[in-house]
């Protein structure tokens, strides 16, 4: 994970001091990219311990289409607590957009000379899998969580907003575009989450895993994370762990938490930092 350390150092060296929505303040760089070859290991940061339970359960929650934190709370995951309302709802965030992206469908009849439409939805994950099977060479294997019409109703607009698959030479690759990247707290989770998603998609479609490409718009370190970042950079990255999927799963929607084993993960101690809300 030297790429991640290099990105942190680059922002410390070249970042611009900015204000932000949370009022915390950041050092920011615009337009950064890292590439992780999953053949070299599972990209889980080793210079601080990450909460694997949160990473896995959050991804399963996204894929289920759920947008209430009840499932997360039942499984010991609290990373969305600050944004949920009193009922645990977050509005039409990631899971909703991935599985029920709103669309208008042509209906029967007209209103005067105008056609009639009815409200429908697109299950982007199911359509993606169908397209992989029918057109594996497609350059349209894209899922988006950014829906301008729904952004005002979201507790937190999607930071990791769009991702694309590409299958080349029998390997499946995934590129994520992340509009806003909290480099210390959020990005290590995002890297692991989308690497896990790539493993899951490759598993159910029969491809080898290739690379995870992480493209970031605003990559920033919050002003109250500076000492934590410097502590992390004082530590040396260790060998990456390996991911093992414990059973043969045929549907992306059938994975369970127990299906994933992380082998050889020997991280340095946790480094705590406040979340900017």
From Swiss-Prot:
Location of the protein in the cell: Cytoplasm
GO biological process annotation, one example: dTTP biosynthetic process
Location, primary (coarse class): cytoplasm
Keywords in alphabetical order: Cytoplasm, Methyltransferase, Nucleotide biosynthesis, Transferase
GO (cellular component) term, any one: cytosol
Pfam families membership: Thymidylat_synt
EC category name: transferase
Domain of life: Bacteria
Recorded metabolic or biological pathway in which this protein acts: Pyrimidine metabolism; dTTP biosynthesis
Binding site for dUMP: 21, 139-140, 179-182, 190, 220-222
Protein name in the entry: Thymidylate synthase
Protein species of origin: Ruegeria sp. (strain TM1040) (Silicibacter sp.)
Lineage: Bacteria, Pseudomonadati, Pseudomonadota, Alphaproteobacteria, Rhodobacterales
Gene name of the record: thyA
